[in-house]
């Protein structure tokens, strides 16, 4: 049976190719030509049969009662000859050269002449090219040409990145209906409805005279009951444009009653703009007005989670619910890496080693990735200028700092500091660290970068602590740690730098210290229950967690060996003690650990 299907498919492809090649030859040799399409000053000889087979528009035209002379020469108004030429060649060859400069014109013309094959190719092309800079234009095109597939794709792209895109100039040029199609969407990726309100009012003020009259209609798409009541009173009720609009003022009164717990009776004739029409049929069920809609946006399911990143996957752990969620596959992430989450909740991974055969001067490179929270994919960024390991990572004002470490080619200790600017998308060097060090740790807080401990050139642990001010470009000493150490955990917890475990001159350590940033003093905290190195500390939602690391474990041979452990502990501040939470979380194996905010709506529970 399979062989019969394969034969049938082979014959179909052969016949299709034969037919296509034959048609192309007939056009090029101008054989059996029975019509000419005219666009501007250009003429295009064609075959009625081919045009009719590929386009319902031309089929209806050639089968109509129009006199024969008009069928022989068809004048097409407002058609770019170059675009028409591309479409005709596609009909005869199944090949078309789409690019960013012509795709919208080809799309519009194929829509006008009802050529579904070209239309579909253009839709697929535009969907793949969606970007923050063009998504609103593509949304507008999809709505204009009544193409739900394209309009929905563009709208979902805008919704996922609403906080960024609502600041663009193109957003301010949306028509009222285009704006409504965006802000009525349940999928809007906003943590607070206040963001939607502020974007709408900025849109209104861009053309206040003309848009104030559309405010009532747009108003219905804002979900005011999701706002804090204080914000509603301070910013919505007191807005000068809202106060001067009688129609909107009636809705404000209803909303004030709703905040007081008095909802109106649902009505089948209730205004439904923003109540869900764009997301599906609303039917005849009783509805509240759209502005009373209290269904959370998809972006409102954001939660503080611990992100575990290893060379297999990035998994988010919720310590409150003891649940794990798949965030992204991570097969391209190197096992020995460092990771960082920025103040803007952007996750970066740096490290590992690969060979760039095209780079003859510096073939060894270190990976650099960023996690796209929308697509759950890792985006490759420019690699480190010099491959290194055992370095520290910091961040200030969205710039990433790679501090010291070991050169992967020479194994020499480093004091150099690299800075990545995401706007320029390139690396540069900044002020060197005062000493060469590796196996240290780096943490950022309040616009400063702190470098702690590590091993120096003589392979001895240091207790030195440095602070870097990016604005001044200098490193300064702070009070040293009580215990010199390397390969330890660090976190900012309740305004203090907390360090735990690590390697000392005497071996593995269980000691924990906290540095008071205000007093420049270290204090001893309760020891961790087990001596460990490479332990991860994470401060999440006011709680401090310790995850994994390496401990000396007795083997069956009775010998002790450094062994990876994958448990989770929580520091109970009131009792000043460590409490075990999970004996093993398998996703922690070989993982770096971060405190981040992720949208549960987009994640799959494991």
Curated annotation (Swiss-Prot):
Domain called BACK: residue spans: 135-237
GO-annotated biological processes: myofibril assembly; protein ubiquitination; regulation of myoblast differentiation; regulation of myoblast proliferation; regulation of skeletal muscle cell differentiation; skeletal muscle cell differentiation
UniProt note on tissues of expression: Skeletal muscle. Localized between laterally fusing myofibrils in skeletal muscle (at protein level). Expressed at a lower level in the heart compared to skeletal muscle.
Protein keywords: Cell projection, Cytoplasm, Cytoskeleton, Endoplasmic reticulum, Kelch repeat, Membrane, Phosphoprotein, Repeat, Sarcoplasmic reticulum, Ubl conjugation
One annotated Gene Ontology cellular component of this protein: plasma membrane
Phosphoserine, modified sites: 3
PROSITE patterns (alphabetical): BTB
Kelch repeat residues: 346-398, 399-447, 448-495, 497-542, 544-599
SUPFAM superfamilies assigned: Kelch motif (SSF117281), POZ domain (SSF54695)
Main location: cytoplasm
InterPro entries linked to this entry: BACK, BTB-kelch_protein, BTB/POZ_dom, Kelch-typ_b-propeller, Kelch_1, KLHL41_KL41B_BTB_POZ_dom, SKP1/BTB/POZ_sf
Localization per Swiss-Prot or TrEMBL: Cytoplasm; Cytoplasm, Cytoskeleton; Cell projection, Pseudopodium; Cell projection, Ruffle
Domain BTB span(s) in chain numbering: 33-100
Protein modification: Ubiquitinated by E3 ubiquitin ligase complex formed by CUL3 and RBX1 and probably targeted for proteasome-independent degradation. Quinone-induced oxidative stress increases its ubiquitination.
Subunit structure, interactors included: Interacts with NRAP. Part of a complex that contains CUL3, RBX1 and KLHL41. Interacts with LASP1.
Stated role: Involved in skeletal muscle development and differentiation. Regulates proliferation and differentiation of myoblasts and plays a role in myofibril assembly by promoting lateral fusion of adjacent thin fibrils into mature, wide myofibrils. Required for pseudopod elongation in transformed cells.
Record-given protein name: Kelch-like protein 41
Species of provenance: Mus musculus
Gene: Klhl41
